[in-house]
Design a protein with these regions (language model features):
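Phosphate/nucleotide-binding beta-alpha loop and adjacent structural elements of enzyme active sites
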Residues: 1-202
Length: 202
């Protein structure tokens, strides 16, 4: 079995369904972590511009370094949410990669960050791929699109099967219910509580 890496399932999907990646023009990545996936997107989708959102102050220095490596990456240093008046962001003390706008059920520090709603940020152009890695805040992210969720063609979403890590966080069934206007094209259960979903507009 090949080692797991963040875009492995997406690459498998592209190969299995013979997706013409040259047709992708616009990619939105929410929860960029370090912008390494954004750099991978520039290779997988040679004609796409990637807009990457990350707000974790501990991660932003590395995001800036990686985003600067490609003129096709725009880094937006804001937290995507359906409640932009809430600026509180949680930084777990020990578990790397689990920072969230949702309150964790484990030890954390907190910080205030800039926020944004996607409905206000986006123009009317189509989004070929929406990538979401939001650590429990998936439905908040999707809600922030409002009617502009209709502009999205393909969604890749990492989500907990059962929400046991965050207070008020999303789980897989809630995300699928929110995306009932999309077709679930592929699903990977990476571990008993981590599901990766690829959905397409019906």
């Amino acid at each position: 079995m090949q080692p797991w890496y963040k875009t492995a399932f997406l690459e498998q999907y592209i190969s299995e369904f013979n997706i013409d990646t040259s047709l992708f023009k616009s990619i939105v990545e929410i929860g960029s972590y370090d912008c390494k996936e954004a750099l991978t997107f520039t290779k997988l989708f040679p004609n796409a511009h990637i807009v990457s959102f990350e707000c974790n102050p501990k991660l932003l220095p590395q995001c800036r370094i990686n985003a600067a490596k490609s003129e096709r990456i725009t880094l937006v240093e804001k937290c995507v949410t359906d409640n932009p008046d809430n600026h509180l962001f949680y930084l777990p003390k020990k578990l790397d990669g689990t920072a969230s706008i949702c309150q964790p059920r484990f030890l954390y520090d907190s910080v205030e960050v800039d926020t944004i709603q996607m409905e206000q940020f986006l123009s009317d152009q189509p989004i070929d791929l929406l990538w979401i890695d939001a650590q429990g805040a998936e439905t908040q992210v999707l809600n922030s699109f409002g009617s502009k969720l209709n502009q999205v063609n393909t969604i890749y979403c990492e989500v907990d099967v059962s929400q046991i890590r965050y207070c008020g966080g999303s789980d897989e069934s809630q995300v699928l219910q929110k995306l009932s206007s999309f077709t679930l094209s592929s699903r990977l259960l990476l571990n008993p509580n981590e599901s990766h979903l690829i959905l397409n507009k019906k």
